[in-house]
Amino acid sequence: MFNMSNYSEWDEGVSNRNFHVLKQLENRPEIGKILAIDYLPLTFKRALRNYKEDLVLNVENSKTIKRGITSKVSKISDKVYVYSDVNFFMRPNVAMKEIRKMALELNFGDLVVWSFFPFVAPHWDILGQKLTIFDAVDNWTLHSSYAKQKKRLEQAYENIKNSADLIFVVSKNLLNFFDDQPNVYWVPNG
């Protein structure tokens, strides 16, 4: 699950849609292991923040099971593992290959990708998943904080439209954004 925030933020009380989806999946007996991917950095500044908050520091009551120079995997529970990475902004394909490698090492079996983070879409085929779900909580091309990434986001959204098996949207306006495709479903919060 590619998140739009870091597990450490959830551990400190931040709550958002992907946190609630993760908790629902964790409580379902038919769901196996979950690899929660922390917000992947798009800039050097964010990579430094992720390094400090997620690679150096540890989530309370977690166990670090693997640590590298640019990544770390923490075990939160028998079902939930958290992958933190600072490499994505410079080498997204390398970061995605590392995520795939980690899923294999942890014996995840058939992968289902559930992403809240549009920037991974051009690279998600590297993972070899059986099913791809994109959960759109907003149109990020309209956010001022992503103005410098607008072209990249537009390409990512085209990739999502063309390659996601399922697309969930939080608002009816996003149905139009995804061209009212038959694989797009409105799933409001709550």
Protein language model regions, located:
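A conserved catalytic-core segment of Leloir-type glycosyltransferases
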Residues: 42-106
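Membrane-proximal helix-turn-helix segments that form the acceptor-binding/catalytic region
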Residues: 100-102, 148-167
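Carbohydrate-associated surface elements
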Residues: 173, 187-190
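N-terminal subdomain of nucleotide-sugar transferases
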Residues: 1-61
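Active-site proximal beta-strand in glycosyltransferases
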Residues: 1, 114, 125-141
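An aromatic- and histidine-rich active-site surface loop
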Residues: 19, 91-96, 112-128
